[in-house]
Amino acid sequence: MVQVNSNYLKLKAGYLFPEISRRVNAFCELNPTASLIRLGIGDVTEPLPQACCKAMKTAIEEMGSTSGFRGYGPEQGYLWLREAIAKNDFQSRGCQISADEIFVSDGSKCDSSNILDILGTGNKIAVTDPVYPVYVDSNVMAGQTGIAASSGHYEGLVYIPLNAENGFEAELPSEPVDLIYLCFPNNPTGAVASKVQLTKWVEYAKKNHALILFDAAYESFIQDPLLPHSIFEIDGATDCAIEFRSFSKNAGFTGTRCAFTVIPKSLKGKTLDGAEVDFWSLWNRRQSTKFNGVSYIVQRGAEAVYSLEGQSQTNKLVSFYMKNAEIIRKQLTLAGYKIYGGKHAPYVWLEAPTEMDSWQFFDHLLNKANIVGTPGSGFGVAGEGYFRLSAFNSRSNVEEAMRRITSI
């Protein structure tokens, strides 16, 4: 009989969001007339920017003609999109990133998992706690961890707590690590990192010959012009970091699928015998072998994000969701909840009532207010006692959700 990847059996029962769906479905079966408001999973609700729609319509018409038809595109993405990304997202902020260091993909979730394909085994890995579950689960699947201990932590991982006591600032590990996952603005806490904080991480990574995997999926929600949007705004980061970005949240591409990963050509790792190898070549080989690229139509839609019309429309989308976050923060603060995040990210992180754990508060909101949120414990041990609410919904739903929560 064929053998399975037994590392999957080490995963804790139920990925966070499927477990939420299971509980919600069970509730709906018992309460078919209930009007649920979903502020849980970070999926957008507003329509795509019209600039993107127009560009994709034009691309569809091109594909329907003999002269405009395109088959397989470059696995790394079309050059015109990569050039637009490099110019607008990096070079405009002083980052020395070129178009050929950008790899277009169908999602940063995929990239942050698939990057393990080019990393060796035995690396010491650091993650924040709480953390986006994909970082941990993908390492478990790849055999990079031991089993989950009774504490809830996986053996072999170094956990960096993010909590109210440390101001949700990721502190440097007390021991050398090889691989570091950072996400700022942070999912789930909504915390943001300053240039000073990121500089400490870059200096640590260079000193310890470590690699930073930097998830900047929510950078467009940063409101303070002094805060960095990219790890590459920090001197030396091109020698120690890979960055993941996405069009999912700023342009509403969660169902359209387009993202990109930035791998500087100067970034190097080593083989078991100590020889240096650049990560760019490894990732390029990986993508050429396992990925056929994002569709031409979708890439034209992504390119339109950088047009004047596209920039105006995506800025309005971001402002809309951040206004929702402001409403959530204000109303829950008035109701006596302790609130964090929501200022530079579309997520509000709050403390559950003292008599409830995270899942009890989830069930409380579901049953008493018909509101779906995300229990903090689903993001890690340090998330216990916290709860995440997403600003991704209509204005009327957010206002109604706040009315319901504050009245129970």
Swiss-Prot record:
Residues at which pyridoxal 5'-phosphate binds: Y72, S108, K109, Y132, N187, Y218, S246, F247, S248, R257, N292
Keywords, comma-separated and alphabetical: Aminotransferase, Pyridoxal phosphate, Transferase
Highest taxon listed in the record's lineage: Bacteria
Family matches, as Gene3D superfamilies: Aspartate Aminotransferase, domain 1 (3.90.1150.10), Type I PLP-dependent aspartate aminotransferase-like (Major domain) (3.40.640.10)
Annotated EC: 2.6.1.83
UniProt-listed InterPro entries: Aminotransferase_I/II_large, DapL/ALD1, PyrdxlP-dep_Trfase, PyrdxlP-dep_Trfase_major, PyrdxlP-dep_Trfase_small
Assembly, per entry: Homodimer.
Entry similarity comment: Belongs to the class-I pyridoxal-phosphate-dependent aminotransferase family. LL-diaminopimelate aminotransferase subfamily.
Protein name: LL-diaminopimelate aminotransferase
Organism: Prochlorococcus marinus (strain SARG / CCMP1375 / SS120)
